[in-house]
Amino acid sequence: MAQLEHIEAIEKRLWSAADTLRANSNYASNEYFLPVMGLVFLRHAYSRFLGVKDAIAANLPTRAGKTRPLTKEDFSQKSAIFLQPQAQFDTLVALPDSADRAKAIIEAMESIEADYENLRGVLPKSEYQELDNAALGELLRTLNPEELKRVSGDVFGRIYEYFLTQFAGEKAHDDGEFFTPVSLVSLIANVIEPGSGTVLDPACGSGGMFVQSARVVERRHENPTEKLTFYGLEKNATTIRLAKMNLAVHGLEGDIQRAITYYDDPHELLHKADYVMANPPFNVDEIDADKVKRDPRLPFGLPGVNKKGKVSNGNYVWISYFYSYLNERGRAGFVMSSQASSAGRDEAAVRRKLVETGDVDIMIAIRSNFFYTRTVPCELWFLNRDRQEALRDKVLMIDARNVYRKVTRKIYDFSPEQEQNLLAIVWLYRGETGRYLDLVAGYCQRMLAEGAACARAKHFSPVPDFIAALATLRGAVEPFLMTLGVGAKNVSPLRELDDAIPLFKADAEAFRKAVSEQQAAWKTQKISNGELKKAVDRLATLAETSRDLVKQCDLLYKLACRLIETCENECNARDSDAWNARDVIRARKAADEARVLAVEQLKQVRYFWKQTNWLTERFPEAELRNVEGLVKLVDRTEIAANDWSLTPGRYVGIAPEE
C-alpha cells in the first residue's frame, strides 16, 4: 500500500475508534472536541520528541565522563518540543486504572506550557476532568497504535488536520466555521507560492493557511520557520487555542491575536504584508459603518450602508482589508462568497476600483458543497501587486465548478491530481511551461509505475494474487465436481470459467510485457511538448487494456460465484460429503478481496493516463488558450462591458459534454 493510502487508512481508523468511544461515553461532540485534539497534539509532540532524541543525545558534550542532560533548546533547534518524563505519551498510556488519568494529563500539559511560553494557556487541561477515567484510558490507547510508532514524516500533522475536518463536519465548535477545507487552502497556497516574508490571515480559524504555506516552502527543501513569519487574527478564544496547537503540531510558531478584525488591527500590518490568505465569514450584515468608515484599510470606500447604519454586506470590507494589507509586491488569495464577484450598486463601484488597480490576477469558481458547514458555491480571489506589465489589464478566469471529487454524499473536494491540473493552468498563464511539461511527464511515469505494480507491488502482487485466489476457489469446488463425472461438463459456469481463466492469464501477461517495454522506452523519452503528446497517444493502448482487464476480473469473479450457486442450487452440492462449505466460503471471500485489490490497482493505470489526456487535450501546444467552460483570459474592456463582474462563469461559457 502506498504511504499516503496507509496514512489515510490510519486516519480513518483512529477517527472511527475515537468517535465510537465518544458515542459509547454519552459525550456530545463539543465536550469531546478539545480533549481529543489535545491528546492528538500530545501524541504528535511525543512522536517528534522520539524522532530527534537519539540524534541529539549522540551529539551531547561530555565533561569529566558525564554527558550533559537534554535541554529544551536542544529540541527547539530540531523543531520539536522537549517533553518532561510525565508528559511523554507512553507514560500516560501505561497508567493503571487506579491512577487519576485526568490529573496526569493535566500535569503533562502544564509541564509543556511551563517550558513554552507560546503555548501557555493554550493546551486543554480542565476539560479532561469532564471525562471518566476509563474513557480517558481507552482514548490514550486508541491514539497509540503500534503502527504509528513506525511512521515517518508529518503524519500526526495530517492526523490533526483530519480530526479537525471530522469535528467541523459535526459542527463540534463554532458551528464548524473554524475550518477551511484542506483542498481549498492548498490550492490558495500553491497559487500564491509564499517564498519568504510575512504571512497574514485576518480570519485565521484553526490556522490551516499557515500550515499549507509552510508545506509550499518545505517542498522547496527550505525551512518555513526561517522563511516565513505568521500573523493571525481570530475572534474566538477556543479557535485560537486550536490554531496554536495546529501550528505547534507542525513544528511552527505564529503570533495569533484575539480581535474582531472589522474594528481592530493589533498587528498594524497596513501595506506591510507579503502574503495575505483568508477564508472570512460570508455576507455579514452587522458591521457598524460609523466605526469603519474612516478606516485606512478601506481604500475604495464603504461598500454601501443600510438603514440600520450597518454595512449592507461585509464581503467588500474583507476584500478591501486584504488588499490594503499588501505591500507593493504582495500577493493575496482568499475564499469569498460567489455573490461578491457580481454584486451590484455600491459593491460594484468598489469592485470596479479594485479591477482598475490592475492587481486582480486570478478568479477561480468552486462548486457548492466544498464546505462542511455551507452548501453554497464560492470563489477564490487572487490579487497580485507585482504583476507583469503585459497582464495588468487582464484577469485569468477559471471555472472549476465541474472539477471535483465526491468525498461523501454531501461533501466534495479536489483530488491531488485535480488540484495539480488547475495549477497547471496557472503555470501556463505565467509562462511556466516547464512545470506544465514536468507534470504531464510525471503522470506518464506514474501511470507506468502503477502498471508495473499490477504484477508486483511492494508487499503483494495484485493481478497474480487474484489469479492464485481464483485457482484456490476453483480447487475448493473441484472435489465435488469430480463426483459429477462427465456431468460436470454440463455445468455452464464451469465451462465459461475454465475458458476465461487462461484468456485472462494471457492478457495479463501481455499487459505486463507491454508495460515493461514502455518503461524501457521511457528511459530515452524527451520532455518536449511534441514528444510528450506522442507518448500520451502511445500509452492510450495500455490505459484501455487496463480497463479491459478490470472487466475481466469482475467477470471471472461473477462466473466463479455462479459456479458455486449452480453447484448448490442445481446439483445439490450441500448434500455431498465432497462439498466443504467452509472451504468454499473462505476461498470465495479471499477471491473477492483479491479481486478488489487487483481492480483498484488496474484502475490506477487508466486514471493517470486520463490526467495526461485532460491536460494535453485542452492545451495541445503547452500554451494557455481559452477553453470553453473552463478558462478564459479576459481583458479589462470585456470586464467593463459585463458590469465589472469577476464571475468566471460569465466569461468562459459552458463546457461541452464529454
Predicted regions mapped to residue ranges:
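Short, contiguous acidic/charged loop-to-helix segments that flank catalytic cores in large enzymes
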Residues: 26, 287-313, 338-347, 367-373, ...
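Conserved S-adenosyl-L-methionine
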Residues: 174-278, 282-294, 299-305, 316-317, ...
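Short, surface-exposed amphipathic charged segments that create phosphate/polyanion-binding patches used
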Residues: 270-272, 376-383, 411-417
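Conserved Class I SAM-dependent methyltransferase catalytic core
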Residues: 29-44, 188, 240, 244, ...
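Short, exposed interaction patches on small structured surface elements
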Residues: 398-433, 642-658
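Helical mechanochemical/support elements of P-loop NTPase systems and associated helical scaffolds
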Residues: 6, 10, 28-31, 135, ...
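Short, solvent-exposed loop/turn segments at the edges of secondary structure
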Residues: 225-226, 374-378, 391-392
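Non-catalytic, mostly N-terminal accessory regions of nucleic-acid modification and defense proteins
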Residues: 1-195, 255-269, 365-368, 392-399, ...
